[in-house]
Every structure is written in C-alpha cells, then in structure tokens.
From Swiss-Prot:
This is Large ribosomal subunit protein bL28. PANTHER family: 39S RIBOSOMAL PROTEIN L28, MITOCHONDRIAL, LARGE RIBOSOMAL SUBUNIT PROTEIN BL28M. GO terms for cellular component: cytosolic large ribosomal subunit. Belongs to the bacterial ribosomal protein bL28 family. HAMAP family: Ribosomal_bL28 (MF_00373). Keywords: Ribonucleoprotein, Ribosomal protein.
Length: 82
C-alpha cells in the first residue's frame, strides 16, 4: 500500500501544474504521509502505521485501540505491513 493512509484511505490525486503563462501540465498531489509507531497497551507491543496528518488527529480523538479495530475490520492492516 504505497502512498495511502491506513486510517483515512487518502491517496494521491491528479491535477495540473499551472505556470504564470497559464500553461498546464499534469502532476500528482500526494497526501502528507508519515510512518509512526504506536504503543498498543492491550497487545503489549508497538504497531507501525502509515498515516496522513488527518489520520493522526483521528487517532488522537478516538484512540489507537478503536482505530485499529476499524482498520482490521476493513482488512487494511496486516501484522507485517511495514
């Protein structure tokens, strides 16, 4: 899963570079992704996730345990994904 947020599902989108002369060339807009280790107290281990900045805020709001159960229910998290 390259360049996809594991929490929000954000992925690259396409658009245009626009020059001062209004010339347009195609480009990709990438999400603001970071790899991060979270300590999961219930499993007594670290879990590595690839997250966007919005994914971090969702984990701050809901908690890592709830977010992990949602990711596993969607089938997007493998134990050796990173």
């Amino acid at each position: 899963m390259a360049k996809v947020c594991m929490v929000t599902g954000k992925r690259p989108i396409s658009g245009n570079n626009v020059s001062h002369a209004n010339n347009k060339t195609r480009r990709r807009f990438y999400p603001n992704l970071h790899k991060h280790r979270f300590w999961v107290e219930s499993e007594n281990r670290f879990v590595k996730l690839k997250l966007s900045a919005k994914g971090f805020r969702i984990i701050d709001k809901k908690g890592i345990n709830i977010v992990l159960t949602e990711i596993r229910a969607r089938g997007k998290f493998k134990e050796s994904s990173l």
